[in-house]
């Protein structure tokens, strides 16, 4: 589906419907996972997975949330979240990590503001960015002020569960 989009052999409608169906499949699989015990190597942790307001790409975040849950983590997923919503959310709930989806085409400055709003007052939550934007921005975490950047869910768990020093935004 993604390759067809890149090669311009699939219409916007086809890709949108295909992604919606894939998300429905993920939700169906999550229900069946809930009926089975977690893996023996289950990870604990409390994560917030967020897709910034206006982003059109949500499938990766939905899949990430499902993978984290299957690994034993407690996960909250917010789609189309504003910076204001994130600021309120991290002040009212404690998360070990906030995982932010960053898509190609996303404005770096607005993403930096979103990352900043996603920090709790005490900077105890690690803020980790991932997504397609990493393929074109190797220094993304430094540019937006995140603690780390990865597209590997296993690495996100490890980074989220250990204390990372908060980095200053590189201007």
Each PLM stretch: what is its role?
Residues 1-35:
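Long amphipathic alpha-helical segments
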Residues 33-37, 49, 56-57:
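Long amphipathic alpha-helical segments with strong coiled-coil/leucine-zipper propensity
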Residues 40-43, 121:
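Short, flexible hinge/linker loops that cap or flank conserved catalytic cores
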Residues 46-47, 98:
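Conserved hydrophobic helix-helix packing surfaces used for dimerization/oligomerization
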Residues 52-69:
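Short, charged N-terminal beta->alpha structural module
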Residues 67, 76-78, 82-140:
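Cofactor-cradling patches in redox/metallo enzymes
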Residues 133-135, 139-171:
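Peripheral docking tails and interdomain loops at the edges
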